[in-house]
Amino acid sequence: MRSSIRGPSRRRRNEALTRIVEKFFPPLSQEFDRLLASLAGQKLVVIGHARPDGDCIGSQVALARVLRSRGFDVICVNPDPIPRRLQFLAQGMTFYRTDDVLHSPEQRAAIFVDCADHARAGDRLKGRYPAPVAAIDHHLSNVGFAPFSLVDSAAAATCEILAGIFLDLGLTIDAQTAQALFTGIMTDTGQFRFNSTTRRCFVLAGELVARGAHPADAGYQLYERETEGKLKLLQHFLASLRLECNRRVCVGILPAGIFESTGSNTEDTEGLVDYARSIDGVDIGALIEERADGTFKASLRAKDPAYRLDLVAAKFNGGGHACAAGLNLKQNTENFYARLVAAFAERLAAVDAAKKAPGH
């Protein structure tokens, strides 16, 4: 005999979940509402950063779709193409490249997403849109480069901010928008395991699943479609790992020409630096990408936000978060490796000293 006792319906469970947090980002939601009012009648462009990741593409897709549902004419522009594994998010949408808009006479109000500063979209897009109307971002190093600055460095992802704002304001989140937002949160939290992952992340993720996001689809597209070239690149990266600072820092190097020799490309570097950080006893991991012209790109990761890698990156005109930062040197810099390791050593010493201070 089946019990007549039933639990709450799915609708009631979803309503209860929404009530757990009445408002996710009250000040930013009010600011976004004012932004929408100020943009009435204008054409818009949503711009992301170079080498776009899940949070960047997810933010662009979601924001563009919500703005279109409000009647706006919106396009998305990136300096680089959408990575192969993220193309599922933008199905049915056109993403333009820098050259497509550089000489267009069409005027559009620019909204930058997931960009800590104006230049993250590249110098040419910065020049094409010198006065963005808004920036929506979560980087600790954000410099506040737009009149409407919707920035919260406590958020794990720009998609987290957008999801909260859309829910706060009761804006329409369809299944594709939910998938984009969920994927952005999932990737920037390291599949919900980084220090930035909060209760709010899980509540928002649940709301997005209720609106059509499929975690399994995101997991398959992102983590179960590796190419042979990516695995060859990983092999070279692991073989290059060096331990520094009494084995508390691990650095891997990708030499110039490695993409051609392995049949990989720049998007295949995604996630490699996490292997350097994952070693037991290592506090900081780094990936250095050397270029043929002698310049460098580096990705930095820490296990503890106390190490403030955004400060390390800032020494080289980079930026980011306390646990995840990056830099891109456009000019040849002698002894870059030694200088970077020295900067790591300074942060380790500062954290060690703080832990020994009275009252810690």
Language-model features, listed with the residues they occupy:
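N-terminal amphipathic/basic-hydrophobic helices that include classical n-h-c signal peptides
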Residues: M1-R19
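Hydrophobic helix-and-loop "lid/oligomerization" segment in the mid-to-C-terminal part
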Residues: T18-A50, C56-Q87, L102-A109, T187-H360
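Glycine-rich, phosphate-binding/catalytic loops in enzymes
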Residues: L63-A64, G127-P130, V151-D152, V203
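Metal-dependent catalytic neighborhoods of phosphoester/phosphodiester hydrolases
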Residues: Q87-L89, G122-D123
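Short, hinge-like loop/turn segments at secondary-structure boundaries
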Residues: G92-F95, Y129, V151-A154, K303-D304
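Active-site cofactor/cluster-binding pocket
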Residues: T94-F148
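Solvent-exposed alpha-helices and their adjacent loops that cap or buttress functional pockets
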Residues: L102-P105, L125-R128, N142-V143, I173-A175, ...
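Short alpha-helices
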Residues: I136-L204
